[in-house]
Amino acid sequence: YKRQAKHRLTDFSFSQIKIVFEQWGGESYKEYNPTIAMLKNSIFGEGINETFFPKNAMLVPYALFWIALVLAVIAFIAMLIVLFVKTDNARFTEKLMLTVVYATILGNYYNFCIRYPFICTMNFRYIIPCMLIGLINIGLFTDLCNRSEKAPCKAIVSTLSYLSSAFIVLSYITYFFVASTNG
């Protein structure tokens, strides 16, 4: 059982992300990695799949997935950086509190997923506060970078702006297709 749990938490093989929609069975496999399933579910929910998109627009959900993944990783890294860098807009205790809340929710989510190994357990709805904390940390990190005169900081802010804009546009297009399909 422990090896199975470890495998579920650490396996990030390509077969799981070859299809960016949640896989419930009958497709290539069933979701088992809570991190990947959470990301897929946060974007597409349990019911959106390739049938909602015209063949010539399949790049849209895939680009949205990968941009969301990059933004999630940036948010996590930003949280760690912001926690330990002195900032004017948040005290260490406030940043530590957000980090502890994030870690507690995420830890409980993974525990829940391991104890109840079902696809529906790996739903994004169980960790929505983590997304909000990630957004706060991206904001604090962006503010920190905007105060810096260093070129890498300016490049990071520009990259975040472009990625966020692309995420918004691709989300709109995605849900335009979903709404058009459901009529």
Describe the predicted segments one by one.
Residues 109-128, 179-182:
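Membrane-interface catalytic loops of GT-C/OST-like multi-pass glycosylation enzymes that act
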Residues 80-90, 135-160:
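Membrane-interface junctions at the ends of membrane-embedded or membrane-associated helices
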Residues 89-113:
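Transmembrane alpha-helix segments characteristic
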Residues 121-142:
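Hydrophobic/aromatic-rich transmembrane helices and adjacent perimembrane loops
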Residues 72-79, 102-109, 164-175:
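Helical transmembrane-bundle signal
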Residues 145-182:
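Signature aromatic-anchored transmembrane alpha helix within multi-pass, membrane-resident enzymes
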Residues 93-101, 127, 131, 157-159:
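Alpha-helical transmembrane segments of integral membrane proteins
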Residues 2-79, 83, 94-102:
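Lumenal/periplasmic acceptor-binding loop at the mouth of the active site in multi-pass
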